[in-house]
Amino acid sequence: LSCAQRSPPAFVQRCLAAIDAVGIETHDLVVEVTETELVEDGSVAEQSLLALAEAGIQVAVDDFGAGYSSFDYLTRMPVTYLKIDRRLTRALPTNARARRVLGALVTMCLDMGVAIVAEGIETEAERDAYLEIGINAGQGFLFSRAITVERLVEDLRAEAGAGFSAG
């Protein structure tokens, strides 16, 4: 979500109306906001995100560690997921200091009930380094290149049908 998209309360009302119109559960949704936007426009973000969280929508902070990394917003905002920026992913396999920082972050997030997702995983070494420090959710080219919605639906249907016989 960009700052322009989420000026309260109109943004929250539009979101909830759209969710109601398509008939999905709010707890099945995750809104994603960048760390930079939280720091640069914190009051607008805070109002909108708190209202969305009250409605049951989960909040993910994207690109964590890329810029400001303010712990202040983690104490005020209803954060469900922290998505670790790919720059930290690149450093992790060979940088002991990066491993210690991220290891401490894992401990803190576990204590707060915040899940961590590693972004930009391209190599097995990066994946393995994250697994070693306790992060077991990630995304990146190691797992899949970007695909269209149509391709995703195709893949999910194929996966759902795998292993079943029609007779």
Q: Which sequence ranges carry the predicted segments?
A:
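Short, well-ordered coil/turn segments that N-cap beta-strands
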Residues: 24-29, 55-58, 80, 110-114, ...
